[in-house]
């Protein structure tokens, strides 16, 4: 079906979002058209505001509106422990359980040779630099329990073994093939408690 150009552009824009196919994009576009103009303008402003005012922390890579982020700036945090995660959403998931008090390092991805993503394409060099500069005694590998997450954890483990830094991996209370962001606080808490040395 041929839509007027403004609707077609809106549909195309929605289809650029992950998990949004043609049918869902059409539904979203027509829903937006049915909304009051002030609500649509607020939505558009929120999108632009987020894009303009959010950045990644220069220390840990978490999403933030200040640099360094509130976690890296918090003097009450245990600076001797770094929890390595794949995405900023994983930091938010870990923080929800309110049990971990160390710092984070966000890799912004995982090693995936099938997708052409190697160790140099994610924030592993930045992690190694942090470990030289900081007084870190433990690294918790909290990458997702899927093939890419496991490969990334094993790669980092091999790199860090000679350093003498204590290495642990969160326990697999998380389902294999799952993502941290979808886990509830109890599951994450048990996974963190049951981490093992590597």
Swiss-Prot record:
A zinc finger (C4-type) spans 57-72. Keywords: DNA damage, DNA recombination, DNA repair, Metal-binding, Zinc, Zinc-finger. GO terms for biological process: DNA recombination; DNA repair. GO terms for molecular function: DNA binding; zinc ion binding. CDD domains: TOPRIM_recR. InterPro entries: DNA_Rcmb_RecR (IPR000093), Rcmb_RecR (IPR023627), Rcmb_RecR_Znf (IPR015967), TOPRIM_dom (IPR006171), TOPRIM_RecR (IPR034137). It comes from the Bacteria. Residues 80-175 form the Toprim domain. The keyword Metal-binding applies. It holds the Pfam family RecR_HhH. May play a role in DNA repair. It seems to be involved in an RecBC-independent recombinational process of DNA repair. It may act with RecF and RecO. Belongs to the RecR family. This is Recombination protein RecR. It comes from Bacillus licheniformis (strain ATCC 14580 / DSM 13 / JCM 2505 / CCUG 7422 / NBRC 12200 / NCIMB 9375 / NCTC 10341 / NRRL NRS-1264 / Gibson 46). The gene is recR.
